[in-house]
């Protein structure tokens, strides 16, 4: 798999994850709240959940645009936005693991760690523009000659 294809697949995975998460929260906020990794946190607040779901869907739009265009600045912007969201999410949950069993906390941190690692690796892959070039477009950084 080429760097460009790998980058596109990774962006697609991130976008798909945000779509699923966002739709779940927007359409079924109480069901999302009942998830064991969420329900032990501060009291249920539908407004905040709807905002979080909407923000997840908004991030999905930017990630989908990056997948569609593979334009360097948009790809990097989308990935950095995803990374900021993932890092802050991980840091919050890392401070609130007490109610979880050791196995559940370890699984949760592994999942959140992967949500940080994937966009970080993709930023590294996209940073110099090589992976964004169309096959046969040497030196254009993915932009038309």
Where are the language model's segments positioned?
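Cytosolic juxtamembrane helix and N-cap/initiation of the first transmembrane helix
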Residues: 1-18
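Hydrophobic transmembrane helix segments
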Residues: 16-48, 53
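Core segments of alpha-helical transmembrane spans in multipass integral membrane proteins
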Residues: 44-67, 84
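Individual transmembrane alpha-helices with interfacial aromatic-anchor signatures
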Residues: 52-54, 103-117
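Loop-to-transmembrane helix junctions at the membrane interface
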Residues: 68-82
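Hydrophobic alpha-helical membrane segments
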Residues: 78-93, 113-117
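Membrane-helix boundary connector in multi-pass membrane proteins
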Residues: 91-107
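Membrane-water interface at the C-terminal end of transmembrane alpha helices
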Residues: 114-136
């Amino acid at each position: 798999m080429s760097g460009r294809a790998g980058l596109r697949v990774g962006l697609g995975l991130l976008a798909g994850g945000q779509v699923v998460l966002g739709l779940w929260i927007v359409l079924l906020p109480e069901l999302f709240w009942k998830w064991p990794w969420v329900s032990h946190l501060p009291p249920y607040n539908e407004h905040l959940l709807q905002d979080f779901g909407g923000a997840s869907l908004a991030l999905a739009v930017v990630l989908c645009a990056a997948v569609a265009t593979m334009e360097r600045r948009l790809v990097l912007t989308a990935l950095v936005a995803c990374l900021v969201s993932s890092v802050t999410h991980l840091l919050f949950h890392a401070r609130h693991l007490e109610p979880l069993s050791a196995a559940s906390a370890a699984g949760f941190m592994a999942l959140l760690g992967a949500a940080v690692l994937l966009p970080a690796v993709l930023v590294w892959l996209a940073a110099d523009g090589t992976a964004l070039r169309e096959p046969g477009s040497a030196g254009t950084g993915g932009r038309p000659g």
